[in-house]
């Protein structure tokens, strides 16, 4: 059970702990072997590492359903610029996209580099919507990201050394649909938006219980 969760959501949830240097595909394979899904799947999954995924807030095809790295992190550990340890723990995890949660909380714990003696603890609280930009989603220009350490900072505020991620379950039935568009690219782009909206809350596809697991556009 992840910290800060009460009520119906307070139940054991599958997670996976990884070192920063683990290749993304190896994590996906380990999750798959356990019947689960690791949501972070950038196109560089065969070469990228977990630490880089956090530092870049990586996403991928499954980000449509479960969000980017930030949405799926339960805990991570860093070395700060002063050489001490920092552990960041997501509280009240919604097991989905972070911007859909009204208030988001992180517990930050600092420890001495040599003795691991606690140096301080604080709770970082912010609106979930602050993690995304209206009409854009992931905002790569927002390096501050509400003050959340490590994520999307590209290594500028410390070194990621380990992380724990929530895992998901794919629906029992899946289908792959291929659509062809002809004519100008500008005519295809609105169709992509319409397809995505169709499966969002309020869309007819979503109302029918169908989820969009991931889109690919060529």
Regions found by a protein language model. Give the residues of each.
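FAD-binding subdomain of flavoenzyme oxidoreductases
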Residues: 1-9, 14-198
């Amino acid at each position: 059970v992840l910290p800060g969760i009460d009520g119906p959501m307070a139940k054991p949830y599958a997670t996976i702990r990884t070192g920063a240097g683990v290749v993304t595909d190896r994590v996906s394979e380990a999750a798959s072997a356990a019947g689960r899904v690791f949501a972070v799947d950038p196109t560089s999954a065969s070469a990228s590492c977990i630490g880089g995924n956090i530092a870049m807030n990586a996403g991928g095809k499954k980000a449509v359903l479960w969000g980017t790295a930030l949405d799926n992190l339960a805990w991570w550990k860093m070395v700060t610029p002063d050489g001490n340890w920092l552990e960041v723990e997501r509280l009240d995890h919604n097991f989905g996209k972070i911007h859909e949660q009204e208030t988001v909380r992180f517990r930050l714990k600092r420890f001495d580099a040599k003795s691991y003696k606690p140096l301080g603890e604080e709770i970082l609280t912010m609106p979930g919507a602050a993690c995304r930009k209206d009409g854009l989603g992931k905002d790569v220009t927002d390096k501050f990201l509400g003050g959340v350490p490590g994520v999307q900072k590209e290594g500028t505020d410390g070194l990621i050394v380990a992380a724990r991620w929530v895992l998901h379950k794919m629906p029992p039935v899946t289908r792959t649909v291929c659509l062809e568009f002809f004519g100008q690219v500008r005519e295809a782009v609105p169709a992509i938006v319409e397809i995505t909206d169709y499966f969002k809350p309020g869309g007819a596809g979503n109302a029918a219980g169908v989820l969009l697991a991931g889109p690919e556009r060529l």
